[in-house]
Curated annotation (Swiss-Prot):
Compartment(s) of residence: Secreted
Organism taxonomic ancestry: Eukaryota, Metazoa, Ecdysozoa, Nematoda, Chromadorea
Organism: Caenorhabditis elegans
Glycan attachment sites: N44, N58, N72, N92, N109, N136, N172, N192, N213
Name under which the protein is recorded: Uncharacterized protein C35A5.6
Signal sequence residues: 1-19
Amino acid sequence: MPLLHRTIIFLQLLGTISSNYNAFFAIMVTNPTVVQQVNQIEVNLTQSNPQFVKFVHNISHLHIKLNTVELNETRLPIVQKFLKELPKAMCNVSYSIPALFEGTAVMANTTLYGKVNPMSSSVISSVHQKIFSLLNNTEIPSVDVHDIFHPRMNIVELDNRKHEDLLQIMSNRTGDFKLNTGDFIKEIVLFNSTESGSFHEEIGRAVLAPCSNFTLLRFKKPELISNRVPIFPLEMDFK
């Protein structure tokens, strides 16, 4: 093969690789009481430890990350179609996703996150698995790096530099890290993983709905009846 031909093929391949980018599905947590509690957690942490100011998450964009995928210009129409069909495919898993929190926790001494209760964790994990299964039937590759999915809402994420012991701070000041409320979420949003401005650029969203909204599934019995539960009162203490 002539050198010029090989060079052209290499440049075409390089261009294809460079145009790929990651995107992630997420459920946005916008309940005012949750936002207020997270804001207080961040204030309590940063007032005593100013070094953490640049690592706290913007309370306007609190979210629980689901699946991560690899996109490009060719796959963009495919994922838009995927989002359009997602509510119908998801309705027998959950059309109202509970994000009910029972405190905060620290992971690897670098990430402070809101911990969802067991019921929420089970439903969100089912949603994650359903999206993963649906993606397997498309040309959109999943690039999730975790073997076991653990849903969480990150509040503070530190970099690799040396910082004060986040776990020790939290252990000594447990009253400063209370999070005991939640919400039911009815949208799944897809974002470009590359940050843009104050957050990430939205690619699209899927508004969830019960199966009765879709003619073909009108008489299909939901698989997870236990997902349809009332929200807990906001003042309830999850410990």
